[in-house]
């Protein structure tokens, strides 16, 4: 049991010094009180100013205590005033029953398999300001179980070099100053899914290149996940994705509103209403929409899912990039599960997943569920200090314990 203590109302810094980080464990009736990140605070006040007695009769001044455990009665001195706030975080997880069919898409690991069969993912994005975004999406894909990830990022500002440095396991393709799409397009035939947008920025050069890449990907029927600034880009030309049922759009609140306005303009709708996710998906020709928020709504206009499982209250930059990487990988798995199957095998798969299930929508829904669970695990261990890297490190456990356990709760391969 432990308490996190915040000391307030500093009078001076005699005891700590002006910038000392004070960490000390105090044992009080089997409760460990952990003092963290205390600056400019006078922790002890002597009842006697005599230097010879400065270490005697010290009184611990507790201005406020926030605890994640219930304090035992009488554990603190009766002379100490404290307020407590109980907070708990259960790490249990139960896969939603309407996702059971998704397990049919998850590839089994076999010794005869070769590299690439569990997913080859492409990520196009990054800029001088946002180097981390494509890295987060790419490394999440690898941690989830994709075999190969290609990152297409600009050389300008050292973006591509920085990503290479962050992970030698990512295959990084530096783009020239014009971000020539001809550097990317030849690789599209060798990947299963292309994620466009993480950290892309809004420069005219980046957008021009992204438009050409989207067109090329659509021409070869390549599944895509569009996130971040790629969503802003298509708001200027919705025909880039309209009617393409192999694209998943993952807007946050602001991006969703922009997409809704663009769709209404395209369809001559002058109302002030924001389109529902289902109506937006239909207006764009049944693309898959993932409306991110406190409750994620996933729909292709025909079938809809909602994900309101508890994640974490902490918000840190990069969570959307993690989600894009997870959805991209799950989408690749669904597509690969359908490839090379005989008509009899496809019929059996259709029976196991259900007649009306959308592979793309299922992948997006499963991605939302998994990322929330990973965030929950990360927050349990790191609390307020949780960063995106902590969530990524929790992805493997979220996958195994959330999705890949047998009836006895044992992890499957």
Curated annotation (Swiss-Prot):
Pfam families: Carb_kinase. Residues 98-402 form the YjeF C-terminal domain. Gene3D superfamilies: 3.40.1190.20. Its EC number is 4.2.1.93. One of its GO terms (molecular function) is ATP-dependent NAD(P)H-hydrate dehydratase activity. One of its GO terms (biological process) is metabolite repair. It comes from the Eukaryota. It is an enzyme of class 4 (lyase). Its cofactor is Mg(2+). SUPFAM superfamilies: Ribokinase-like. ATP binds at residues 292-296, 311-320. (6S)-NADPHX binds at residues 199, 252-258, 321. It catalyses: (6S)-NADHX + ATP = ADP + phosphate + NADH + H(+); (6S)-NADPHX + ATP = ADP + phosphate + NADPH + H(+). Keywords: ATP-binding, Lyase, NAD, NADP, Nucleotide-binding, Phosphoprotein. Catalyzes the dehydration of the S-form of NAD(P)HX at the expense of ATP, which is converted to ADP. Together with NAD(P)HX epimerase, which catalyzes the epimerization of the S- and R-forms, the enzyme allows the repair of both epimers of NAD(P)HX, a damaged form of NAD(P)H that is a result of enzymatic or heat-dependent hydration. Belongs to the NnrD/CARKD family. This is ATP-dependent (S)-NAD(P)H-hydrate dehydratase.
């Amino acid at each position: 049991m432990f308490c996190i203590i915040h000391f307030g109302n500093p009078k001076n810094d005699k005891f700590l010094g002006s910038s000392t980080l004070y960490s000390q464990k105090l044992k009080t009736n089997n409760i460990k009180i952990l003092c963290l990140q205390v600056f400019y605070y006078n922790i002890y006040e002597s009842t006697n100013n005599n230097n010879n007695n400065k270490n005697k009769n010290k009184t611990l001044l507790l201005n406020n205590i926030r605890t994640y455990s219930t304090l035992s009665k009488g554990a603190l001195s009766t002379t100490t005033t404290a307020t407590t706030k109980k907070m708990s975080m259960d790490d249990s997880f139960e896969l939603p029953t309407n996702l059971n069919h998704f397990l049919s898409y998850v590839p089994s690991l076999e010794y005869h398999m070769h590299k690439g069969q569990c997913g080859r993912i492409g990520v196009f994005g990054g800029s001088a300001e946002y180097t981390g975004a494509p890295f987060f999406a790419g490394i999440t894909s690898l941690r989830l179980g994709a075999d190969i990830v290609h990152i297409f990022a600009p050389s300008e500002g050292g973006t591509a070099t920085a990503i290479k440095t962050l992970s030698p396991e990512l295959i990084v393709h530096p783009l020239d100053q014009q971000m020539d799409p001809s550097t990317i397009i030849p690789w599209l035939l060798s990947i299963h899914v292309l994620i466009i947008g993480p950290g892309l920025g809004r420069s005219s050069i980046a957008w021009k290149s992204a438009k050409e890449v989207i067109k090329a990907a659509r021409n070869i029927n390549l599944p895509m996940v569009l996130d971040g600034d790629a969503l802003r880009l298509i708001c200027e030309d919705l025909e880039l994705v309209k009617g393409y049922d192999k694209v998943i759009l993952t807007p946050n609140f602001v991006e969703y509103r922009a997409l809704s306005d663009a769709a209404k303009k395209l369809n001559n709708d002058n109302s002030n209403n924001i389109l529902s996710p289902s109506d937006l998906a239909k207006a764009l020709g049944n693309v898959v929409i993932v409306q991110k928020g406190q409750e994620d709504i996933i729909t292709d206009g025909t079938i809809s899912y909602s994900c309101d499982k508890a994640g974490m209250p902490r918000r840190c930059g990069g969570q959307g990039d993690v989600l894009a990487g997870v959805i991209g990988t799950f989408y690749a798995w669904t597509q690969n599960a359908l490839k090379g199957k005989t008509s009899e095998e496809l019929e059996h798969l259709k029976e196991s997943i259900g007649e009306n299930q959308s592979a793309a929508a299922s992948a997006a829904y499963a991605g939302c569920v998994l990322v929330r669970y990973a965030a929950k695990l990360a927050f349990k261990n790191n609390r307020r200090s949780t960063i995106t890297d902590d969530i990524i490190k929790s992805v493997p456990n979220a996958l195994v314990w959330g999705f890949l356990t047998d009836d006895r709760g044992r992890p499957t391969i």
